[in-house]
Amino acid sequence: MKQNIIIILFILLFSTTNTKACEVCGCGSSNTYLGLLPDFKTKFIGVRYQYMNYNTVMEMDASQFSHNYYNTTELWGGVNIGRKWKILGFVPFHFNKQIDDDGITTNNGLGDITFLANYKLWNKISVKGNSGISQQLWIGGGIKLPTGKFDVDVKDPAITVADVNAQLGTGSFDFLWNVMYTVKMGNWGINSTINYKTNTDKEGYKFGNKFTANSIVYYKIPQKNRWSISPNAGLLYEHTAQNTLGETVIDATGGYIANVLGGVEIGNHKISFGISAQLPFSQHNANGQTKLEWRGNGHITFAL
């Protein structure tokens, strides 16, 4: 029964999505966002959905514009190995759409598959007053495989930043590093994560490395039958370096963005689902020509 539910939900999400990279921004196709992980004891599998909307207006000619939509449906899962290790896997499917002054273009398919391995470096439980304080520190890393389609000739002078960003993958093996810290006191908790992604090149073309940091505060409200509701809020910061072709820096790529985020998680020991949204309060992408409107995330996840 559980397997049938997972398959049905995956099909429903897969059939309603629609994406695209910005015309001149350095967003790229791969964006592994962890958020709040489900609090299951052993292993889990689920489906996540991510939406992003970017708008671009060319600085020198306002008649040249693009509205870019990233929608990603992602199969994800994790398994705890002993008490120290957590292995995570992500299989994304992108549905790309761009509306610009030249018309509408789409590009859909499998993205770059990612695997992460995290090690619990520190675990401390202490008592303060009537409340216990739990702290955990995880460190880890992973690899992003070039499974997404990347079929442009980057050395062709007619190829634009938009053509490269529209690809379903980066065409390269890329590496991820992360640190996660969680502290819980009573029903309150804070989850903070730092990620850094280092990219290799595809035929000399290299997407800019990306630094991401976020911190989320949540409050767990117990319900009947072991259910709980956890509203959450936090901040996220991303900085992406400019793309390069050989030793040449590609103009109108890279930038930073700072978002405020909020959401809610609902679950028990067998199932978890949640939604969240992000709104930018400061950003500068592609020389200020590209702006993020908002991001949305949702998931449904099952313990196995």
Predicted ranges, named:
Residues T19-R48, M52-T56, I125-Q136:
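Outer-membrane beta-barrel biogenesis signature
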Residues D102-N195, E203-K206:
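Outer-membrane pore/translocation modules
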Residues K43, K84-I87, K124-V127, N187-I190, ...:
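Repeated loop/turn-to-beta-strand initiation elements of outer-membrane beta-barrel proteins
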Residues G35-L36, V47, L75-V79, G89, ...:
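Residues on the lipid-exposed face of transmembrane beta-strands in outer-membrane beta-barrel proteins
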Residues K41, Y69-T73, N108-F115, Q135, ...:
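Residues that define the transmembrane beta-barrel architecture of outer-membrane proteins
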Residues T56, Y205-L304:
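Outer membrane beta-barrel transmembrane domains
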Residues Q50-T72:
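Surface-exposed strand-loop-strand hairpins of Gram-negative outer-membrane beta-barrel proteins
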Residues K43, V47-Y51, G89-F93, I139-L145, ...:
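Transmembrane beta-barrel strands of outer-membrane/channel proteins
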